[in-house]
Amino acid sequence: MKAQTAKDATTPRGQFRFLSASDWKDYELLDCGEGRKLERFGDYTFNRPDAQALWPPQSPVDTWRADGEFTGGDDEERGAWRFGGNPPPESWPVTWNGLTMETRCASFRHMGLFPEHSVHWRWAAEKIRNAGRPTRVLNLFGYTGAMSLACAQAGAEVVHLDASPKSIGYGRDNQELSNLNDRTIRWICDDALKFLRREERRGRVHRLRHDVPSL
């Protein structure tokens, strides 16, 4: 992707602001539109749904060539991955800003991380580095930990919370892959609201970051 930028654009459904992720050799948004997006993760390309891609694509969707495609109806839970002649392995590493994270063709059309969030990872890391004091971050609904790793790499003490034991396990693996075992990240599998109520009773204060899942 090109350097991080923000620009406004008008579509038939209104005006939007587009954020472009910064220099990321292992990820590339190749095309998007008509409710789908074509992306590259490392050496593999994927065609998967994206309800926010409301505009016409640069090339017709039926001409896209991908190593994997998530097919099915509008219901993500009923869809499935379909692979061509160059199927990806069960998981493979991608790097960003000195971090290494595993990606995979997961359920619900996901890839194990959200590359569009990298603008937020970079923003959070810059805030932590410029804080001039010790920083604690509570990352709710943290998934596989990209934000937590970026914050820990920048020097914060991180509490990572997710309700999925599998996601917590992937996050721990990503911490090891990124050589951040010397950084403080508490990996907690719990309900977010219950955890917050306990933290409030204990009088603990964090910088709060959350990405609430679709309900």
What are these regions (language model features)?
Residues 23-42, 46-115, 122:
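Non-catalytic substrate-recognition/targeting regions of SAM-dependent transferases
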Residues 8-28:
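Short, Gly/Pro- and small/polar-rich lid/capping loops
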Residues 115-133:
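Conserved alpha-helix/loop element of class I SAM-dependent methyltransferases that forms part
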Residues 132-143:
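Conserved class I S-adenosyl-L-methionine
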Residues 144-156:
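Conserved SAM-binding loop of SAM-dependent methyltransferases across substrates and taxa
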Residues 209-214:
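Non-cysteine beta-strand/loop elements that form the S-adenosyl-L-methionine
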Residues 164-208:
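S-adenosyl-L-methionine
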Residues 157-163:
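Conserved SAM-binding motif I beta-strand of class I
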